[in-house]
């Protein structure tokens, strides 16, 4: 029934198996990849003709994690997988980015890649396995794909690079570096780094590229036995129409790209495009004209060629800057009066309002992952409204791009955050992109760093970020610092670097062409270092260090420790005691399993009240000490006084006063505040208190005064 083909190799100390022919046989390409005991099924299906009027390449990548893969049932109400999690969205992007540039130019048939995690051994992250499986499925499918690619994760433990470290090994690693590439070149880099140097990071990229070569060979060997016939696709010959369009509007485009303002430049480019469409597009007046979509593609190619040649020949860019020049920067802090921390970061025509909010343990985000449930204490949310680029558009839940940009900034900042023990707050940052003309994710890094310091978060060091670009031709290359949106679209590489003055904390790279050498990457990292240092200097004009105190409206948190055996008493039966403390003091209280209690409130008095209440429950009163209490019950033989948290004690009628008390209610009333001394405990453990040995006005211990009075005089 099955024509199963397998290829097995040893890779990174574990066995990688690629299998086809058993599962999902109706897909154009299907590969089951197994690494350790982690299994991912990748399928690739493509339409055999493009949709009419299609003017872009419709590639969709979906990565999905099934809870059964880890022997779990989803924790959601319907108990089934629902909307993609952040991890699924990010991994979908991770797979998409290196494969998209490798489809044959001009291919516009719909392609869908679906990667399904079938088993997770809780040691090997499925993301790398999914990237390998997706590449293999595409190669087998016959789609015009210039792969294969492979991917690898690199850790950095004790000064050594580690290929495909386990989840446990990653906890000790100073680097989480994911690299994807072909046999010849790196195509994509994604990372979170604990302040390493440019040389260490570049070494990790090189190590990963070398380490993935056996996987590329394995995919090729599998394809030799299992691949379908290549799909017959011939790109359109556009040389003739390209020459005509360039003759007509080449000069207009060159003039348009001399305009430094984005809006004015785009208007001039639009006019040039309209001129070409009017002259050459098929219409009733021009039935022999060219297809509008084809013309649009030709226009983009001419546009890119003009800009790229101009930069290489003159060293000047679209807005007049040199290749290593950063746009003017302005950082402002404290821009929102009630926010815990806020900053407005503007770089040229890119602007981000970043707002920090501090919360308590109640505000942590519960993540239900295959590896298990955990709480996230640091969140960064990036919003990109359509008005930021002067357009109308969809508003609603964040798209993949917003999730990805937010995660990039999150990775850049996280290594510089204080430990939870040092700063026991949940931190949420929101970045609102108000203007965008390139590098809004790096503006988010810079603005968020300022907003954290404005909130009083003890950031280890300020973090800045910069987006780099590349123009690569046969006769030379140019690395561009702080790229514009147009330079991003027309260039060959998007290279984002974030870090402190002492090292890199995050690197993301997407390469659109083959042939990016180690020399070019080294040059880009060196140039980025100069740009980051310049940006940090500009940020320092707004703020150089975190504020010494939290903002007026931020919650204050204090931590105390109680014996573990006292936790039950603090919580009370059914939570009765802790609810009463919260209700009456107005403080938020979080009790850890180890007896650590975090008390949070906007006002210090509320924290103090809750703290004293908890201490009174968790500690024991001392014999001989004087306490202020309240009469809670009067009986014939005395009065019960609440004197130490929830603890009551008996003041016997004989201990109320030095004078005879005939009737207790004649001397005391319920609710009356009194001062008592703890005499000790009777045989049954009941508390014995005394009022008569305490001065009810001053709280002085009269028994000690009497002892002093009875002491003999010195001889």
Curated annotation (Swiss-Prot):
Q: What class of enzyme is it?
A: transferase
> Is Cell membrane one of the keywords?
no
Query: Might you give the EC number(s) for this enzyme?
Result: 2.7.7.8
Disulfide linkage: none
User: Which residue ranges does the record annotate as region Disordered?
Assistant: 692-715
Determine the domain of life of the protein's source. Bacteria
Output the SMART domains linked to this UniProt entry. Answer: KH, S1
Question: What HAMAP family does this protein map onto?
Answer: PNPase
Its protein name is Polyribonucleotide nucleotidyltransferase
Show the taxonomic lineage: Bacteria, Pseudomonadati, Pseudomonadota, Alphaproteobacteria, Caulobacterales
